[in-house]
């Protein structure tokens, strides 16, 4: 395991213990995002937070918002497989201004 990954896990554990579960989870998602969505999608889309039970993903063009809408179930399934638990019920996709 790399030092970077160990540090990320230590920071996540600290944030969870301090009651910042969403921040810790967002960090976990960000660390595996490119592996789950692929480098091309990761170039144009990134997880930015949560709204209710949905993961908020920001994209750089409306076309990517449409594409991610079609891929939502696949992305959520990939995140669940990577992290070992469900992370959100849906995706809320926003276009960066």
Regions found by a protein language model. Name each.
Residues 69, 80:
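A short local structural element in Rossmann-fold oxidoreductases
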Residues 53-60:
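Short, aliphatic-rich beta-strand segments
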Residues 1-34, 43-49, 66, 73, ...:
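N-terminal presequence-like segments and adjacent domain-start helices
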């Amino acid at each position: 395991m790399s030092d970077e990954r160990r540090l990320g896990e230590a920071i996540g554990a600290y944030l969870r213990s301090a009651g910042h579960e969403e921040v810790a989870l967002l960090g976990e998602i960000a660390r595996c995002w490119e592996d789950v969505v692929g480098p091309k999608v990761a170039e144009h889309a990134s997880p930015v937070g949560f709204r209710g039970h949905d993961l908020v993903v920001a994209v750089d063009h409306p076309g990517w918002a449409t594409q991610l809408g079609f891929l939502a179930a696949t992305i959520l399934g990939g995140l669940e497989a990577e992290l070992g638990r469900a992370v959100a019920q849906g995706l809320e996709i926003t276009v960066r201004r």
